[in-house]
Curated annotation (Swiss-Prot):
Name of encoding gene: TIP4-1
Keywords in alphabetical order: Membrane, Repeat, Transmembrane, Transmembrane helix, Transport, Vacuole
Listed name of the protein: Aquaporin TIP4-1
Gene3D superfamilies named in the record: Glycerol uptake facilitator protein
Function of the molecule: Aquaporins facilitate the transport of water and small neutral solutes across cell membranes.
Cell location: Vacuole membrane
Motif (NPA 2): 202-204
């Protein structure tokens, strides 16, 4: 165990030692993720999505939940973008870490903060709601775990692809409002996948309700899917679309 821990410590670069900025960023992820999960789960509870896991939600209920998640994601990502990047999501954090945009230590701290925040939000909601049913992400009736996995991969891929295009690509013309626009793809994906998998796209968003209710049925789908889709989107965008120079300038005398 000691050797394993030493290898783990050695795997972190020296410039990853937490500083004041890192601590602030982790605290921002804690607060922002708490608010996002609290808003999303409470909206789902208020909208009446408390049927049996796997039951299809009426379109009005699904739309209400999607709008709440879209607004919360857009506003909170914008609010925290200048502090922590406004990840709110382990899939975003891991995807950016794999592509080298954040350090490994910061990624670990972010994910820990996100999971803690989600858990606290859902436990508090159970207390504040008087024990109302906490909706958990579940596969729709007739949807196999593998089908759900692929759906979560695709939904998370689209989320991260849009993030790269609007925020990380230096050629983007909407970087200033990119975080706010991110909420639109969250809402669209929630409508598209809500009755298939619940459209998690976010392991932290799924973790809190599962912990609060003790319902871990097919919970792995909501980890593996997003954690595959996020890095895949980064790889595809950076490999095919994130071109540093559109063309090389001609030298004098060349035609």
């Amino acid at each position: 165990m000691a050797k394993l821990m030493n290898k783990l410590v050695d795997s972190f670069e020296h410039d990853e030692i937490p500083d004041v900025g890192c601590v602030r960023a982790v605290l921002a992820e804690l607060v922002l993720t708490f608010l996002f999960v609290f808003t999303g789960v409470s909206a789902a509870m208020a909208a009446g999505s408390d049927g049996k896991p796997g039951d299809a939600m009426p379109m009005a209920t699904l739309a209400a939940v999607a709008i709440a998640h879209a607004l919360a994601a857009g506003v909170l990502v914008t609010a925290g973008f200048h502090v922590s990047g406004g990840h709110l999501n382990p899939a975003v954090t891991v995807g950016l870490m794999v592509r080298g945009h954040i350090t490994k230590l910061r990624a670990v701290l972010y994910v820990a903060a996100q999971l803690l925040a989600s858990s606290a939000a859902c436990v508090l909601l159970r207390f504040l709601s008087g024990g109302m049913v906490t909706p958990v992400h579940a596969l729709g009736r007739g949807i196999s775990p593998m089908q759900g996995l692929v759906m979560e991969v695709i939904l998370t891929f689209s989320l991260l692809f849009v993030t790269y295009a609007m925020i990380l690509d230096p050629r983007s013309q909407v970087r200033a409002i990119g975080p706010l626009l991110t909420g639109l793809i969250v809402g669209a994906n929630s409508l598209a996948g809500g009755n298939f998998t619940g459209a998690s796209m976010n392991p932290a968003r799924s973790f809190g309700p599962a912990l609060a209710t003790g319902d871990w049925t097919n919970h792995w789908v909501y980890w593996i899917g997003p954690l595959l889709g996020g890095p895949l989107a980064g790889f595809v965008y950076e490999s095919l679309f994130l071109v540093q120079k559109m063309h090389e300038p001609l030298l004098n005398g060349e035609v």
